[in-house]
Every structure is written in C-alpha cells, then in structure tokens.
Swiss-Prot record:
GO terms for biological process: monoatomic ion transport. The keyword Zinc does not apply. SUPFAM superfamilies: Porins. It is a multi-pass membrane protein. Coiled coil: none annotated. Transmembrane segments: none annotated. InterPro entries: Porin_alphabac. The pore formed by Omp2a is larger than the one formed by Omp2b. Omp2b pores have optimal permeability to allow growth and protection against harmful compounds. The larger pore formed by Omp2a may be advantageous for intracellular growth, when the bacterium is competing with the host cell for nutrients whose concentration is particularly low within the phagosome. Consists of 16-stranded beta-barrel sheets, with large surface-exposed loops, that form a transmembrane pore at the center of each barrel. The pore is partially ocluded by a peptide loop that folds into the pore lumen. GO terms for cellular component: cell outer membrane; pore complex. It holds the Pfam family Porin_2. Homotrimer. This is Porin Omp2b.
C-alpha cells in the first residue's frame, strides 16, 4: 500500500463518519414565543392577566406604624408611656367575566405586632404581642358574596368617619362569615340582604370577643340606599338571632362642594345594651357626625363627634397628609367624656389621647 492509497482511504473513512454523525444529529426546536404579562384595566389600576388565562390579578396592601400617647380614649386608662404597633396587610384581588356576571375574589392577611406600656408595671414596662389573621376571604359573583367579610351593618351605610379612633362609641361588630346579595339599580338605588354568622369583637367594652351564632339560625341584615351626585342616604336593619333583638341605623352624606362634605348617622337598638353583636353603643340610641375638608391635593382635615344614650361623648380630629404618593402621615387627637352610666365603668371621667400613623400603601 503506497502513501497515495492510504490518504485516499483515510479521506473516505472521514466522509463516511461525517455522514453517519449528520444522520444522528439532533435538530434544536424553534424557541417558543415568550408570553409577557398583559395589563388588565377592566377592574381598576394594578391588575394584570394571569398568563394563559383571562383572569385578572392584583397584589396590593399597606405597611403601617402607629405611635400612641396619653390616655386610652376607649377605656379611659392612662397609657403610662408610648404604645407602638405595626401591621403589614397583604391583599390579593382577582376578577374575570362569566356568563353569570363578574367573578371576583378578595383576601387580606394581616401581620400585626404591638409593644404597649398600658397597664404594665416594671422597670422596662413593655408588653409585646404579635399575630396573623385572615381578615377577609370572600368570593363574589355578580351581586352574590360569600365568605369572610365585614358586616353589612357597617359596610352598606359607609362605616363612620375618616379618623383612626372612629368607633370609640361602637357601631357594631366588624368581621363575620356571611352570604349576602346586593342589588344595584341604574337609577342610584341599591338594596342588600345578608345572612351573617355574627362578629368577633365588641368595640372593647365588655372584653367579649364572640358574638357569633350558637345554632342554625343566622343573624339577618337588610338595607336600602340612594346615591347621587349630591351625596347619599342609607338605612340598615339587623336582627341578632342570639338575643332575639334588633338594631337599625340611618346615615346621610352631603357633598357641599368638591372639597367639603358632611355626614350624620343615627342608630337605635331594642336591646339597650352594648353587650350584643350590632347595637354596641350605650343605651337605646346613639348619634355620630363628621366632616371632611380636602384643603389641598396632599392634605385633608377630618372631624368626627359621637354621643350615646348612656352619656358617652367622643370627639376626634386629624390631618391626613400625603408626604409623597403612597405615603401618608396622620397626626390625630381624641377626647372622650365618660358621663352618665359610663362614669362608673372607668377610673377617669375624661380621656385625652394622641396618635401618629405612618402608612405606605401600594
């Protein structure tokens, strides 16, 4: 075999091997198109489509830090120092359209921490507490809502004023399990009917935290409302199935100008005791009122006053100032006069308290 034959044989072998490798080569697939997150503006700002679905999702919430001093205007006791508390609230909202109407969900988890001097004796005197609570978790289809929410006795009339210490004179329990249906007409009228489990707080009067039903019979709430450009008027009636008593509230709101609004609310309870789920003011009746003045784009002034049948009077004022978009600082001053039948339940007749709230909402 000469050199020429050897070179020709080697070349032939290389060509054969290359052909075999080419036959076995793996062809890489074409890269799939990337599906970017799409903005969903059907339900307000902050929503986006969950990839691969027509469901819109929003993640939002707030971080809050409160510093309190002076008296506790709910109980009339001296704090003996600063009370501090922090909260992180994580909210998740979803929405999509169906043949039966808009399908929504809302959940809120609250992570709380508090360091309080109130009622603590000792060299350092700080008592700390922390906890996590599922504050809201409900499903809504059209006007039907089921899950954990706040009572329609509060929400349908619009709560109270835009102050922090708004429920020194309590207007009822908040969180409850419920099944409700809200009808909204095109002419400003709306109506609600709700079957509720009962609440788990009473505004701090008795220390009782359980006003939930003890059998199959639910609490029942019904309400009517009319809203227009001038303001609104709403009324609700609630039946407490545990004590077999009822309570009612009527509220009116008036927009005097684009910057200035006032409101007034009156309530009556057949049970005449705060130790119940709905009528948690003292005695037969209570009245609340307030105003809001939007002084500038950044600053709003709020005032609220309340009085009940047993002789408690509560007044609160604050200024909510938006330092930068999403970050609001709110200094607030409150006063409570414990008169009449309330006088014997507290150590001091008069309580002055202050609070500064720092809140970042997102």
């Amino acid at each position: 075999m000469n050199i020429k034959s050897l070179l020709l044989g080697s070349a032939a072998a290389l060509v054969a091997a290359s052909g075999a490798q080419a036959a076995d080569a793996i062809v890489a697939p074409e890269p799939e198109a990337v599906e970017y997150v799409r903005v969903c503006d059907a339900y307000g700002a902050g929503y986006f489509y969950i990839p691969g679905t027509e469901t819109c999702l929003r993640v939002h919430g707030y971080v809050r830090y409160d510093v309190k001093g002076g008296d506790d205007v709910y109980s009339g006791t001296d704090r003996n120092g600063w009370d501090k508390s922090a909260r992180f609230a994580l909210r998740v909202s979803t929405g999509s359209e169906t043949e039966l109407g808009t399908l929504k969900t809302f959940t809120e988890l609250r992570f709380n921490y508090a360091a309080n001097n109130s009622g603590v004796d000792g060299k350092y005197g700080n008592e700390t507490s922390s906890g996590t609570v599922m504050e809201f978790a409900y499903i809504q289809l059209g006007g039907l809502r089921v899950g954990i929410d706040e009572s329609e006795f509060h929400t349908f009339t619009g709560y109270l004023g835009d102050v922090i210490n708004d429920d020194v004179i309590s207007a009822g329990s908040y969180r409850t399990g419920k099944i409700s249906y809200t009808f909204t007409g095109g002419n400003g009228f709306s109506a609600v009917i709700a079957l509720e489990q009962g609440g788990d707080n009473d505004g701090g009067y008795t220390g009782t935290t359980n006003y939930r039903i003890d059998g199959y019979m639910p609490d029942v709430v019904g309400g009517l409302k009319y809203a227009g450009g001038w303001g609104s008027i709403a009324g609700v009636v609630a039946y407490d199935s545990v004590i077999e008593e009822w309570a009612a509230k009527v509220r009116g709101d008036v927009n005097i100008t684009d910057q200035f609004s006032v409101w007034l609310q009156g309530a009556y309870s057949s049970a005449a005791t705060p130790d119940q789920n709905y009528g948690q003011w003292g005695g037969d009746w209570a009245v609340w009122g307030g105003l809001k003045y939007q002084a500038t784009q950044k600053a709003a002034f709020n005032l609220q006053a309340a009085h009940d049948d047993w002789g408690k009077t509560a007044v609160t004022a604050n200024v909510a100032y938006e330092l930068v978009p999403g970050f609001t600082v709110t200094p607030e001053v409150s006063y409570t006069k414990f008169g009449g039948e309330w006088k014997n339940t507290v150590a001091e007749d008069n309580a002055w308290g202050g609070i500064v709230r720092f809140q970042r909402s997102f």
